[in-house]
Amino acid sequence: MSNETVRQAVQKTSRLFESEPGKAKVKTPPVTASLSTGLAFRLSSTRGEIQTDMPPPMGGQASAETPGWYMRAGLASCIATMIATRAAQLGITLDLLEVTILSEVDWRGPLGLDDSVVPATPQAVLSEIVRWGEEHSPVARTIKTGQLAQATINLG
């Protein structure tokens, strides 16, 4: 999709949402995590399926990426999408756009060994368009506000 196509689509959608704000809120398709074996899960939704697992030191088999990896992947792609969208709105053609999300895990927290342990937030110097992309990323906003979603849990 060209920059101009993106710009026109966003412009048209923005006009619609300005005139009819109720149309801006949509329900996302459900995602269901089903236990496969051990700590491996199959996540399925209307558009596909992925697998997760944990590393052996945590009791998994490392047969797939961890849930945290998918969170970082979603955050990186959502921020990149918002940056590209903003650039298109401003008529800027990007020759290169890469977003890298770094994190550090202290496994004492997830294991319940030290509840004060929280992941460190990496420091980065961001340009205005990157800041805008991060602030407007639906994934980043959801994570920051803690309004994750409605969860339905079935045990058996």
State where each predicted segment sits:
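Extended beta-strand/beta-hairpin segments
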Residues: M1-A73, I83-G156
